[in-house]
């Protein structure tokens, strides 16, 4: 049983902490992931202490040397945690004292774990956002490249899960790529709000010892210094925003996965997943299950739960730091790991997906050209509302006769409107249908080519300004 007096905070305590409480209170099992960020923060802070005259140059060098050795131990996997290590800060400071002795006790001068932990988190999440951005842009590039190659393939577009209009397969791919581009842009904006220095704020009131926060900012490469010490040490809106960002990104990935799951069924047979991203059944040997996509879809729910759970934690807190905020790190780590894995799996699925061109084209049907009948009449000078009504009557007539739209005779069509003539036969061509949507953003080939080019330009600019 550990003595409370031996803790970093143990001066006013006597006796020992209950072992169950000690385990309950400990966070080192997961916050050790921030070991590098914690060391970087301490390296910067001791330089600020030296500038303020609170440690000598010799003491600073001893501390920096000790921190370098701790960094090496963590890097090599030889750092040994003890039961007394409450968190990553305690562990690193304990080890520093073992290595260099008394000067280690000066490192925490004027610093609280309140500003230390939030500095660690901002450093860790800043780097993690860069990694997520890289995985996200790789997925987008995979999608754009695929769209460029398969631009001539047509298949049904759906609304309300009903066949709607013919579109290009590439148009569907790019619809998801564009949404992910916005996610990448949002991640860049989020990183700006993460990249604010809290170190030097103390526990609540600030730092009274002349620590140069601008020096800290430069050392740790933050964009700015926090404005208010109470806000700096207690606010976790940047974590909440990260969790929301992840929830929205996962929503987009879940929707894409749902589409592909449907398209991969025998009833649709538009796509086939690679064996590398599928599994089978323990009972039914014919099964090829889209587990990769189903897991992506399910992971969205996991991320939503982390986001809503953390917001519920925050909404009940009074001002400044409370131990409830220990919940922030597990949510942050879990969501990062989840989204990072999902993006990599999604890239693999998209890059190896096999498409059934014949199946896609076979699924196109004349009833999907009903809107084109209305457009035909509009081009003949008829108001759209009237044209829409008459195209509905064309559909009704075909259903009454039990035939497809394109099997109606010219006489049948003329019985509905005298504007129909021999050129109506062009309406029954699916390529003609998609090629009429030439306004920017449409599914005509020229428009889809433009989308590909624009996204490739975006990718190039994004690569040049990596967050």
Curated annotation (Swiss-Prot):
What processes does the entry annotate via GO biological process terms? arginine biosynthetic process via ornithine; L-arginine biosynthetic process; urea cycle
Quaternary structure, from the entry: Homotetramer.
Q: Name one GO cellular component term.
A: cytosol
Q: According to the UniProt entry, what is the EC number of this protein?
A: 4.3.2.1
Which residues are marked as site: Increases basicity of active site His?
A: 294
Reactions that this protein is recorded to catalyse: 2-(N(omega)-L-arginino)succinate = fumarate + L-arginine
Q: This chain belongs to which protein, by name?
A: Argininosuccinate lyase
- Report the InterPro entries cross-referenced here: Arg_succ_lyase_C (IPR029419), Argininosuccinate_lyase (IPR009049), Fumarase/histidase_N (IPR024083), Fumarate_lyase_CS (IPR020557), Fumarate_lyase_fam (IPR000362), Fumarate_lyase_N (IPR022761), L-Aspartase-like (IPR008948)
Q: Which cysteines are joined by disulfide bonds?
A: none
Sequence similarity: Belongs to the lyase 1 family. Argininosuccinate lyase subfamily.
Q: Which key words are in the record?
A: Amino-acid biosynthesis, Arginine biosynthesis, Lyase, Urea cycle
Q: Does the keyword Amino-acid biosynthesis apply?
A: yes
What enzyme category does the UniProt record give?
lyase
